Amino acid sequence: MAAQGEAVEEIICEFDDDLVSELSTLLRVDALSVLKRQQEEDHKTRMKMKKGFNSQMRSEAKRLKTFETYDKFRSWTPQEMAAAGFYHTGVKLGVQCFCCSLILFSTRLRKLPIENHKKLRPECEFLLGKDVGNIGKYDIRVKSPEKMLRGDKARYHEEEARLESFEDWPFYAHGTSPRVLSAAGFVFTGKRDTVQCFSCGGCLGNWEEGDDPWKEHAKWFPKCEFLQSKKSPEEITQYVQSYEGFLHVTGEHFVNSWVRRELPMVSAYCNDSVFANEELRMDTFKDWPHESPGAVEALVKAGLFYTGKRDIVQCFSCGGCMEKWAEGDNPIEDHTKFFPNCVFLQTLKSSAEVIPALQSHCALPEAMETTSESNHDDAAAVHSTVVDVSPSEAQELEPASSLVSVLCRDQDHSEAQGRGCASSGTYLPSTDLGQSEAQWLQEARSLSEQLRDTYTKATFRHMNLPEVYSSLGTDHLLSCDVSIISKHISQPVQGSLTIPEVFSNLNSVMCVEGEAGSGKTTFLKRIAFLWASGCCPLLYRFQLVFYLSLSSITPGQELAKIICAQLLGAGGCISEVCLSSIIQQLQHQVLFLLDDYSGLASLPQALHTLITKNYLSRTCLLIAVHTNKVRGIRPYLDTSLEIKEFPFYNTVSVLRKLFSHDIMRVRKFINYFGFHEELQGIHKTPLFVAAVCTDWFKNPSDQPFQDVALFKAYMQYLSLKHKGAAKPLQATVSSCGQLALTGLFSSCFEFNSDNLAEAGVDEDEELTTCLMSKFTAQRLRPVYRFLGPLFQEFLAAVRLTELLSSDRQEDQDLGLYYLRQINSPLKAMSIYHTFLKYVSSHPSSKAAPTVVSHLLQLVDEKESLENMSENEDYMKLHPEALLWIECLRGLWQLSPESFSLFISENLLRICLNFAHESNTVAACSPVILQFLRGRTLDLKVLSLQYFWDHPETLLLLKSIKISLNGNNWVQRIDFSLIEKSFEKVQPPTIDQDYAIAFQPINEVQKNLSEKKHIIKKYEDMKHQIPLNISTGYWKLSPKPYKIPKLEVQVTNTGPADQALLQVLMEVFSASQSIEFRLSDSSGFLESIRPALELSKASVTKCSMSRLELSREDQKLLLTLPTLQSLEVSETNQLPDQLFHNLHKFLGLKELCVRLDSKPDVLSVLPGEFPNLHHMEKLSIRTSTESDLSKLVKLIQNSPNLHVFHLKCNFLSNCEPLMTVLASCKKLREIEFSGRCFEAMTFVNILPNFVFLKILNLRDQQFPDKETSEKFAQALGSLRNLEKLFVPTGDGIHQVAKLIVRQCLQLPCLRVLVFAETLDDDSVLEIAKGATRGGFQKLENLDLTLNHKITEEGYRNFFQVLDNLPNLKNLDISRHIPECIQIQAITVKALGQCVSRLPSLTRLGMLSWLLDEEDIKVINDVKERHPQSKRLTVHWRWVVPFSPVIQK
């Protein structure tokens, strides 16, 4: 066996073409590349993992236990994997076969684990049915006694003789030493790993590593003479008391079981179904409507069992259903025809010796007659598959991995058929019975037979659900293993239990608690069925099992009559006296399963006594009780079992079985919850899953929101179930909704009795339990919760809609009060996004206009935008919302325009959907139209139905934006340039404490490289989502109204494909004007030439950055007759053809040329500009210019010039330029970058620009005091100035205080950049001026590189600075050679200063050397600051060197 696992590890492909196709379609990614990359990573992990036969995982129950921490968001259940031989390795999500060592990391929706196992390792000996020691999950240690020792008993008195019998001891049991076994009195029987005591004859098997043969011997056969001769009574007692599980149980209880079946060895294809047992399949045909024993045998041989409906049969392995059987039909052939992938069939057919025997039973006898009225005339209708069998017909079908699930046990076919085949040492009822004893035994055996007959009927397994739900097969829906935790009453520690562990620990009085619909009833019925089937050895110890529903009994009823009425049916009868005698005799061998418990007071006396005085009867009781009813019964319990939330993999398992014909819908369902991880817990009970299935049956088309559909279906279920109490139900929903709504807006999810009373919720009302849960454990007062936080939101949405729709003004006011708690777009799009989705899913003609109006107003209210930073406990409601909040906040900080666009689209979509669903579009139109006026929206909104109904609203919009982002990702940061900029900088010498102020550039580069790799992987796999122009406005033909302005933004995109070109042609033709902004998208323009040529008269703006303009591109641009704005920046080559023909753009208003590295850019402009009279913005960035004449002429021709930017390191003669600029009285912005003019010539004309708003002279130097004073005086005339970048130089330093005083007279100033020239006195002047009321609108104060300011000067500045309510950015950074080491008192002053700046979001302080204590002070200030969520402190340099640490 070891060699099998040690084979050279091949690369395992866990996916197939179907999966690749499905994922590519649904996720719009290149799934093949993603899956191949995952396959490579999995292979590397697989190579490192241990291989070989794992004897410790032979036990299916142990394998099942390994899945306790397994990810619940998977397609396979732990039961399916454990049954297929897999256990969870703990390495990622890897599962491994205990036998062949196959390791799988992925689960597949279309294939079960046994199918994948067989496909990838068909030679696995476990799959081939060989004896590899597999122990079924319900199997037991005790085996049937063997006869072989009777003649050799004397010989085996000698230990050596016993040891010799172990010569062929199986390899998988080597963890238990033959020498220890023989010393304990055991002899190897030669069958699997079964041993038998030579003295008492007791047989034990399923030995695992660590087992103690003496302990096992003492537990199961404590009266053995050999055992008693070797061990003292105290030792035996200690063995028994320390044994885990099986309290009060010995081997006698299993050996003498009345329900015991002879079970074959477990096979992998059994698929966790009891009907893998032929005998049990045969039993299901008791009510078969046809008369032919031979036909039944053929059906059974083909793996089929009878469902109890018409003549529908189902395969225990694949779950396939067939019906309408006729004479001569061949079950095995039809089974193969309709379900060719059935693992059971494949396994049978792989064994040549099976086929002849199988075929001899294939054909149904010709003489088969029917006792039903089924019509078999239509040959084509014979054997409908499960798709063709109506759900109501298939409701009792037992699925392949059903709740009624059990594997065939590891028993040999040749085990003794009789129950009394043991030696004289075994424990059998005495044959010398008195008459009264014989009477009770006879009655008990008869009762056992009747109970087994009742429990094995399909009608017992099936649960009736109301009306529309009755179309569902509850065996499918409620059949998966529930998740159970055990809570011992005397111990607070909780532990997860598998179902086998639960069965092993059944004793005394226990309860199983859970929510409504959690599966309590089905769990009890499952136990009863498994016991009756005889296929669950763990339950063999019970001779009688009584499943009783307590909902229909009265306190005065006798227990015997209850049993007769509920379980024995017509003709069944047992007296109270006889029942009492049986219980008294059997004691621990009687199990009561009590369902629908509501309280001790409602119980008959007999049951009351069984519970409260269990020490008298010593029976076992398992009581199903709703969570809120546990307190009353807790004093009598030994252990409480609690059913936890229904795992998501169980939900998938149910849907896969019921909707195997529509597997893509199931795939979409999984993807929806994969993308919405916060929703994965909403299927918390099987009843919720039933609601999903009902909705799917009623609505075959996909639902946009799976959670909304689920909650609505659940509420519909409640209304159907409680039709007779419609008004009380409505009142309960309203009061619970009020509680939910109040809790939602106070972040409260746990409530006490006072909260319920205040909301009008009756905590004792049964209907309340359908919506809320009560928790009493370890609490002085009970705590109430809704069935889930999302369900609370849903009920809150129902209540809000009810309030806003009310005729009562106070209700409407209350609803509006709650609605206004959503007072910012951030809240609307993050923590309350799901809530608003639920609100919009409840159409209301009265509520819709109110909700729509409120939400649309949020977009533009500046006050509400400021509310985004308030401190709220977001995590309580939606932990996943925190990241979303940060992303939205970051978007708002980086680009308020993009933020507004995003929330506008999303809130508009919610509002329009609400208005349409509630049929209130007309009522909502005034506020919708007001919202649309002057708005820029994304192209996607035009696909909404509203724009098809009202295309005229396009005229109200400012523009529509379309963004195309491709995969041509470009590195934005050039680290070589950064390193070059530090070439002349000497590393500073600092103390070790301050070394953290410098971060090595290689760390940043490495980190960025890793992120780039991740981004690149994502971009490579991502498919561009095609633009959808098939709905809404785009369905109109012809288009009655056009898009007023189309903004096209193209980033990192290559040439457009044919599909995109067709879309753009359609969109361009529907636009009045078009503006382009292209970056890093070479080749794109040429590729959309056909679209541009059709709409060239509409293109008004073209901005191109970091792309290569070919000759063809330039020619194409020159054909745009109405171009008004042209921008070219950061191109490698000079587009001379385009620039030389600028005069052809007759309407050009804006020209921006940003080619910093190119000299003499102006030289390629045309010589004359006779047609350019409309220029409003002129921005030129070049390295040097030797001739300004063309620029001067262009300005002369531009009487409406508003913006002038010029960056140039050298100008040969600037006098003409200054002269012509002086004539431009309408200038709003002037920026000179680079030291490109004589200062005085500009200062002389500065007073002319009275409308100036932006003046940027940061790169200019004013060396003399006279020029600087004149500049300061000129500032006083610029009353509209908003942004000032003060020049540098010694002259400016000398008059700095004068400049500050002049700036204080500028009422509109928002940005002040004053670098390099301030000292202690002048910087203090800024602080004093602000404190006196100046700079009230200042948002950005940049004081960088002012190295003349001392630490004392800074400290005085910090201590005085105040009264700047709008300041957002303060920068006091210095150059590296001028690092400043400050004292604690200065840090304290800085902290106090920051605290006085309520709007501050950025503090720049590079080259300020801070130690850990300083940083702690700064961080403490940040945490207490009003902008704590947004405030960023920049204090670390990123440098290509390490500082010198002084010793």
Swiss-Prot record:
Q: Does the keyword Cell cycle apply?
A: no
Q: Which InterPro entries is this protein grouped with? A: BIR_rpt, LRR_dom_sf, NACHT_NTPase, Naip, Nlrc4-like_WHD, NLRC4_HD, P-loop_NTPase
Question: Which top-level group of life is the source organism from?
Answer: Eukaryota
Q: Which GO terms describe its biological process?
A: apoptotic process; cellular response to estrogen stimulus; defense response to bacterium; detection of bacterium; inflammatory response; innate immune response; negative regulation of apoptotic process; pyroptotic inflammatory response
Q: Name one Pfam family in it.
A: NACHT
User: Among the entry's GO cellular component annotations, what is one?
Assistant: IPAF inflammasome complex
Which annotated residues bind Zn(2+)? Answer: 315, 318, 335, 342
Q: Which GO terms describe its molecular function?
A: ATP binding; cysteine-type endopeptidase inhibitor activity involved in apoptotic process; metal ion binding
**For the NACHT domain, which residue ranges apply?**
508-802
Q: What UniProt keywords are attached to this protein's entry?
A: Apoptosis, ATP-binding, Immunity, Inflammatory response, Innate immunity, Metal-binding, Nucleotide-binding, Repeat, Zinc
Q: Which segments carry the BIR repeats? A: 60-127, 159-227, 278-345
Q: How does it assemble?
A: Component of the NLRC4 inflammasome, at least composed of NLRC4, caspase-1 (CASP1) and some NAIP protein. Interacts with S.typhimurium (Salmonella) PrgJ and B.thailandensis BsaK.
The UniProt function text for this chain reads: Sensor component of the NLRC4 inflammasome that specifically recognizes and binds type III secretion system (T3SS) rod proteins such as S.typhimurium (Salmonella) PrgJ and B.thailandensis BsaK from pathogenic bacteria. Association of pathogenic bacteria proteins drives in turn drive assembly and activation of the NLRC4 inflammasome, promoting caspase-1 activation, cytokine production and macrophage pyroptosis. The NLRC4 inflammasome is activated as part of the innate immune response to a range of intracellular bacteria.
The protein depicted here goes by the name Baculoviral IAP repeat-containing protein 1b
